[in-house]
From Swiss-Prot:
UniProt-listed GO biological process terms: sorocarp development
InterPro entries: HssA/B-like_chaperone, HssA/B-related
Organism: Dictyostelium discoideum
Gene (name only): hssB
Transmembrane segments: none
Family: Belongs to the hssA/B family.
Domain of life of the source: Eukaryota
Name of protein: Protein hssB
């Protein structure tokens, strides 16, 4: 859902800044409390870069998307390596 919001905002350059903050910052901050249990779902060491709304150009959206995708990949790899059982409720989607 976050990726779809960001892609939609790319087609509206005059609203990129607000969309970037709401689509990346909001979801990352809401998962911050789970960062320890999930092994890096948001918050933690990734929270600053993916949650910052300092990017206001379309290039910033692309960087934000890459970070968001990396977070999902790292959460998936962590679930595989850790057995996945205890990580099912952390909300890293």
């Amino acid at each position: 859902m976050t990726i779809l919001s960001a892609i939609t905002s790319i087609s509206k350059p005059n609203k990129i800044s607000k969309s970037a903050v709401s689509s990346f910052g909001g979801s990352t901050l809401s998962m911050g409390s789970n960062s320890v249990a999930c092994g890096g779902c948001g918050g933690g060491s990734y929270g600053g870069s993916s949650g910052s709304g300092s990017y206001s150009s379309s290039g910033g959206i692309a960087i934000g998307l890459a970070v968001s995708i990396d977070l999902n990949i790292s959460a998936t790899v962590g679930a595989i390596l850790g057995g996945g059982g205890s990580r099912g409720s952390c909300g890293c989607h």
